[in-house]
Amino acid sequence: MRTALKNAFTFAALAVALSLQGCGKEEPPKPAPKVEAPPPAAAGPKTLKMQSSWPAGLTLQDNFRFFAERVDKLTSGQLKIDALAAGQVVPAFEVLDATHKKVLDGAHSVTYYWIGKNKAATLFASTPAGPFGMDTMDFMGWVYEGGGLELWWDFYQKELKLNVIAFPILPSGPQAFGWFKRPIKSLADFKGMKCRQTGIVAEIFQKMGMQTVNMPGGEIVPSAQRGVIDCAEWVGGIEDLRLGLPQVWKYHYTPGMHEPSIVGELIINADVWKALPAQQQEAIRSAVTETFTRWWVKWQKQNADAIVEMRTKYGTQILRTPPEILIAFLKAWDEIAKEESAKNPFFKKVLDSQREYASKVVPAKRFMFPPYSFAANYYWPEAKPAAKDEGKKK
């Protein structure tokens, strides 16, 4: 009996010991519950600060604003353009350098303002006669189908060493010959006149005997009112009306051969461009193309209305530019182009590219397209000049 109790006690003690040993042993930690990572926060709308070279009241600035509106809609508000007018951040002629330095994200201007850096700049805006007879659509064909856009970007990035890209956006041609304080009938009438001209056009007029001065559009009318200049070229039509030119001079000559196919540009800092998502880049490309077309067709109607207002409200005399002056202008341009090509390889490269493209499309277009004046004169014959008073009864 005693032995049985002793064995039972021993067994019980062993069981308790084993039980206590098990309680003292740590269990392996249970894995932490899986927590789903929060979705990445959606990026908020991005705003690009851009400035133009134009006064706020001009339709050139309307082009810029329309572009900004289209980008906003095409990106569902995710990319916005702050389309500032000339002088709101930097002076009108400093927008290119400001974009390169990222003071601005972009700019709305025209390349011939930069001929002080390299005269090839004028070839991406407009040259006399197109060049080589090209109109605006031919020029755009060269840009997109003839290698022009690649040369344009090379001009900025390789020739000028600027960190920018550009797109054609502003078709403000063909442009009128200009405004004068007195009638002009020949080259001799240029002598002694000081005229606001810009870019390579100023050099051409200098060859033709005119004194020239460059200034932003907003300074033209005040300079005319002070008698600092005797004539000026701006754009023509609605732009000249809004600028106030009919209020200072009465003699307006058209057409001109200096900017028949002028195209302004949208400049964007290259780093800003690369940082944009692909969809926003495509939205900008699409908005540029739409702005070019929609603004241009509206502008033609505005120009027609402006011509009527110039005549009826301000008594403007809208006169035909003497052919002698236009031919002299083209000859002077050919001389300058030849001289510049001899010393500027990139100028020659671009001009040769334009000549090659024009050699195909201009003769073909002349063959296929009737002269604009043919049907225009049939339906809307020009009024003949009033007869002189020689036969007047005494």
What is each stretch, according to the model?
Residues 1-12:
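Bacterial N-terminal signal peptides that target proteins for export
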